[in-house]
Amino acid sequence: AKYNYSWMRHLDVDNKYESGRQDDRYTQKEYYLSISGLYSLADHLSLAVAEDYFINSLDNTIPECPFPKRYTSLTALAIQYKDPRLTATTSLLGTYITENVERGDRPSDRKRLSPAVSLSWRVLSDHNFRLRASYKDIFRVPTFNDLYYLRIGNTNLKPERATQYNVGMTW
């Protein structure tokens, strides 16, 4: 479990403001819970499951603040085969995000399944030279800073999706 509280103040002193200054204050809170388990299915085969759940909120002094609150669930399921020369892992990450706002339009819920696969092969049993390869498809939603901070936020931002390929060797 984790709790995070962050506070930011932006003071802009300029004659363009009626009072001669713009004083914005932002408060973000995050509550975070995580649980995981590992089960050995056979000699070289294991199964893991993990759940992360967090709640984020943003308050600020700007009259147009929508006061967003985001609920996020990340569920991962992974299977791994591992012997002295080969490690193969495949996983699936389920992401579910729902957001509420006190003002303005509520963003759509976001749901996504993100697969990943990785292989590592020890070429010679008496040397630690390995060939490896991996594939990952990932999804990231914009942060509250990206969406709601005055002058830099954009509520029309869409989630990012990336596909990652990696091939390499280690010794």
Residue ranges with predicted function:
Residues A1-W171:
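Outer-membrane beta-barrel proteins, especially TonB-dependent receptors
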